[in-house]
């Protein structure tokens, strides 16, 4: 099957062109779905994923019809009920919205299962409107399912799922024996293991009931990589790795899939009391800790820090640099992670570094409240999709990074990302840009997401010395509720308490520009953080610019705090039930900024 990739820049350009050539009414009621496609590696011998663009205005759209070989096979909503772990939480969110306050998202994906191996299929999609009419067909996607792969079960090489046997060698032998296109099956059971090394052209499949449990022995995670070539610190391997010490270039590895209904557990921290989620399901929770308490709260985290300190490393550096993440894929061209549950990393969850054409679909992230327990991070990577996932994370949920300081100018930006149909619970931020912004974070579209209990909806953070920044950011058609802090923060005052990376300060300071936030509802936040907070450093001529906020409803939030901003607009933002003060607007030093067409005078 041909791998289909995409450019969000071209997709956005297409939407803009359509709006320019059509009246708003026609665009809202008659447009067929655009850019129907199959995400990278999201297919196998019996199924295929479909995703498509939605227009900027989705207010008149109720669903999408899915057609296979010209025959209607169902609705996107019904399909997501069956296949998306995010959908039940999204449905519960709207069920509780009795006042109909929130923006209604639309579902723009479907999984077609029950297909025959090695068989040609054609797919189209139609929009369903509120009046019951439908659009014309989308573009047609023609594809061929793969052949049935060779399957190797790790128990064939002696792996034992008893929760105590160390299976590193047995599982690695199974991976090494896997021919091109092979699938490695992990059956039901708890398979304890140290670092494993994936290779090109393979699928790792964790069956229902399977758990890969990280060893708690620091020696089982050898030195593996530097986060950037220009830093001195070396990090240990993750539990699952595609890393080559001699090359981080895109294409060093190709075509890696990690799929299945099983669990990847990093064994990083002790558990605290479990919680119940919105559906009544048990949620594992982990002890909130830091570098001063890791010896008491950690498992693998404790042992890795202790091992590093024993060699003479100071505790802060050991804590920052010597804890393993769960999954690190570096230099990979074409990667797909789907359906697995991610738990309890000693450090971060999933990391895609210097990779392209990477997709996360229907992953459940359960890392709350593990310190630094990000959900998924994209570092200097391009052509990214994240959809249908559920995030309950100890740090940022989806994070973009792009190097630090002057040397980052030699790196590629993180670019072309599309984030949609996700459900975000706890986290320090749902969609996060930075703090490592050196090479730039460019062209990110986050749409049709639901966010609740997270600290921040859209979080852009850096510091002048890091350089770069982010631009071409669109955050739209989403709903937020019960935020711990605020809806949006853009700041150059970020400082990482655990940060020990050595880098040369950038000659050109970081800044953020060309942001669009549109068609978003925000209901209730705790604390006193401004609902929208924007700060640069105008005293040093560091301005953010070209921000457009429009069509937002905010209730039960604190007033805004906006400074160091130029050439920007705030249109049709309605506030109710302010937590403090009588005016929602608080401006510092700004220039050429308007609210509903009126120039702001600080």
From Swiss-Prot:
Signal peptide: 1-27
Single GO biological process annotation from the record: cell wall organization
Gene3D superfamilies in UniProt: Immunoglobulins (2.60.40.10), Single-stranded right-handed beta-helix, Pectin lyase-like (2.160.20.10)
CDD domains according to UniProt: FN3 (cd00063)
Organism domain of life: Bacteria
Enzyme class at the top of the EC tree: hydrolase
Cystines in this chain: none
Cellular compartments annotated: Secreted
Positions of the Fibronectin type-III domain: 32-149
PROSITE patterns registered for this protein in UniProt: FN3, POLYGALACTURONASE
Residues the record marks as active site: 395 (proton donor), 428
Keyword list, A-Z: Cell wall biogenesis/degradation, Glycosidase, Hydrolase, Repeat, Secreted, Signal
EC numbers, comma separated: 3.2.1.82
GO MF entries: exo-poly-alpha-galacturonosidase activity; polygalacturonase activity
Known catalytic reactions: [(1->4)-alpha-D-galacturonosyl](n) + H2O = alpha-D-galacturonosyl-(1->4)-D-galacturonate + [(1->4)-alpha-D-galacturonosyl](n-2)
One GO cellular component, as annotated: extracellular region
Family: Belongs to the glycosyl hydrolase 28 family.
Its job: Contributes significantly to bacterial utilization of polygalacturonate and the induction of pectate lyase in the presence of extracellular pectic polymers.
Protein name, entry field: Exo-poly-alpha-D-galacturonosidase
Source species of the chain: Dickeya chrysanthemi (Pectobacterium chrysanthemi)
Primary gene name: pehX
